[in-house]
Amino acid sequence: MDLRRIMETVNMIDNENLDLRTTTMGISLLDCIDSDSDRACQKIYDKITTKAENLVKVARELETEYGIPIANKRITVTPISLIAAASGDSDYVKYAVTLDKAAKAVGVDLIGGFSALVHKGYQNGDRVLIKSIPQALKETERVCSSVNVGSTRSGINMDAVKEMGQIVIENEKINPLNNGNLVIFCNAVEDNPFMAGGFHGVGESDVALNVGVSGPGVVKTALEKVKGESMDVVAETIKQTAFKVTRMGQLVGQEASKRLGVDFGIVDLSLAPTPAQGDSVANILEEIGLESVGTHGTTAALAMLNDAVKKGGIMACSHVGGLSGAFIPESEDAGMIAAAEKGILTVDKLEAMTAVCSVGLDMIAVPGDTPAETISAMIADEAAIGMINNKTTAVRVIPVPGKEVGDSIEFGGLFGYAPIMPVHKESSAAMINRGGRIPAPVHSFKN
């Protein structure tokens, strides 16, 4: 590799906020199932603290050796609804507390997998887990929860959609920030390294390391050099930049998995913003030529960005997976925050944008008096986009008590802050209360 390319990468790290967003170890807990929940929890704690004992140490060694910042070290586990169902317990909070203790013991930032997969229907463990979510998130600091309510092959479980709206409101009453650790999915993936939606799928190996890259600032800087050029040039520039960013993820992921003695899973090609200036997906879209994100043309610009990132990234690594697209969280992106404050970026526009990117209505703060049925309807809309387009979509929405449009909420850290966004006042309750299942689309019949 020539010196110029090496210096380009050094400059990306020093001046353009390039980092690896996460190294995430996925751990199967299927061999921890036990009819005695205390024994099961002890097995879970022992396995996590053994397998992930050196995860943080190795990540820090690689940061020092390669000079590449690794923002987060995380763990995902098998969905707990599958593990805890054998116990017959009436709630699964103790499993969440065990995950939290294990995460703290090994020093990771977050642990995901307090999850249930109910896209076609409930099993007993799913019902118990979902009812346990509010208390589990109340009693833990690092645990993340997710529920998959639909898929292209199965349709949408509207009973689960209704219940998740109610769970979001229950979380709001305890602590609205807890909803930042809860994601409701359609077409959830098994190898997602990002939080709060990560879990370790049953088709994965016993232990695997997945990597999530970042780098919106790098893409924006590259586009500043092609002002006024055609969209062909813009797309090519994004592809070349994504290649460099992903190559770094592949290098670190392979080396980390080798040192940890685990399988190397995937690199997730998602562009993940932070609230820091110069680390914004919205600013990339504005660099392409929009006066503000949220105006007409936003969806087209985002579609091209997302596709070009995938095309560049696929060439750079052996296994691509996870969510692999541009994230558009309202609270974690300085450009999104600015556009929302001005009223240019709306929930409706964000919904349109999710049709062409990862992942969905993410970290959206809404008025505290928003009804549970309205939250459920937002979930249903997102799930429908995912189901019809055969892609992953999700909702992470945060109703804030006592707040209304014009106010804002401070989350702190990577979550940033969010202006309260208006939602439609017209009720969707009669539709949500029907329950049942929305059938899978006709083009899902592939066999």
UniProtKB/Swiss-Prot annotation:
Q: Which CDD domains match?
A: RNR_PFL_like_DUF711
Q: What is this protein called?
A: UPF0210 protein Ldb1026
Note the subunit structure.
Homodimer.
Q: Which family does it belong to?
A: Belongs to the UPF0210 family.
Q: What is the lineage of its organism?
A: Bacteria, Bacillati, Bacillota, Bacilli, Lactobacillales
